[in-house]
Amino acid sequence: MFKRYLSSTSSRRFTSILEEKAFQVTTYSRPEDLCITRGKNAKLYDDVNGKEYIDFTAGIAVTALGHANPKVAEILHHQANKLVHSSNLYFTKECLDLSEKIVEKTKQFGGQHDASRVFLCNSGTEANEAALKFAKKHGIMKNPSKQGIVAFENSFHGRTMGALSVTWNSKYRTPFGDLVPHVSFLNLNDEMTKLQSYIETKKDEIAGLIVEPIQGEGGVFPVEVEKLTGLKKICQDNDVIVIHDEIQCGLGRSGKLWAHAYLPSEAHPDIFTSAKALGNGFPIAATIVNEKVNNALRVGDHGTTYGGNPLACSVSNYVLDTIADEAFLKQVSKKSDILQKRLREIQAKYPNQIKTIRGKGLMLGAEFVEPPTEVIKKARELGLLIITAGKSTVRFVPALTIEDELIEEGMDAFEKAIEAVYA
């Protein structure tokens, strides 16, 4: 239990966590012996209990440039004293600059070659909602029956009703009854001929296809280049809009600015979405479309109150400038090599516990034979924060700026946790 505590930076008093959580809806499961009070790059601090942690979660792939990034804090302070919000009734320079920058940097760094327009919103699920609406609008303009969406098993696209409808895990969907209709789930492991047959047979009913280039919540599964390339060809031939969800795997996380930059240009999506790292913890998201999609949209087709506000855009402009840099991305790949090397060494020591290591860049997963709940708990006791993905995979998504020595220290703690659990 937390003892009553007066923070040095806030007048807020912590009573017991049980008393505190009585005021929050019951939608999260959190450890009751941990309350984060501050952070610094890839470390988090619990000043209530006098503990510190190496953070391999980065707020679930959000704080790509680290906790308490001083430049982000400076930008927020400056912009908050200038203009926070003026609505989407009017242009603001920060929003215009960011939209142009996303399009230009995307093309420069091998992403969507025909990127054209940007819709700014506040969260990943919102960005995916916009993508689904845009794809459906494009389809319905061609044929009123062309409004279905194809998604994939093990996918996760969000928890609002549209994004939830294309999220695979039934535990998220079934409690809420009927969701958005005309959604089909296919298996990415199926042969291309089977996928092609399904899409061709239902081409007059399918408006869009949504896929994560690297499935995150489903277990850190990178989709093969050949599979994504084949899917784009099939969809293009059948006038189906391809959406890539890069909420988690985008913005340098894969070692490239966008995960779809590993693909040939002809396989690039018609729409892709970004959030999480886009604001380094400040809420902002984006839906990026090509001109084919934009041509289907009209004034009033979509909107958002806070999306593209100057405060969020000012931070995002800095984030994009920092990550869209060859030297920065090379450092991500270098850090990935360090982390992968240690993971494979640990796997070699515990082959009966760890089945495989997979992922790209600093989005890696270690799949265990059994659910790694106790390993994660023990790691936390040893000062390391890690999370799961899927049923039995430990996910590693640290800040892209994590120090090399912290990677080593974190992996030492991970190995000790495995040893303690399986000794």
UniProtKB/Swiss-Prot annotation:
It comes from the Eukaryota. It is found in: Mitochondrion matrix. Keywords: Amino-acid biosynthesis, Aminotransferase, Arginine biosynthesis, Mitochondrion, Pyridoxal phosphate, Transferase, Transit peptide. GO terms for biological process: L-arginine biosynthetic process; ornithine biosynthetic process. Its main location: mitochondrion. It is an enzyme of class 2 (transferase). It catalyses: N(2)-acetyl-L-ornithine + 2-oxoglutarate = N-acetyl-L-glutamate 5-semialdehyde + L-glutamate. Its cofactor is pyridoxal 5'-phosphate. NCBIfam families: argD, PRK01278.1. HAMAP family: ArgD_aminotrans_3. This is Acetylornithine aminotransferase, mitochondrial. It comes from Saccharomyces cerevisiae (strain ATCC 204508 / S288c) (Baker's yeast).
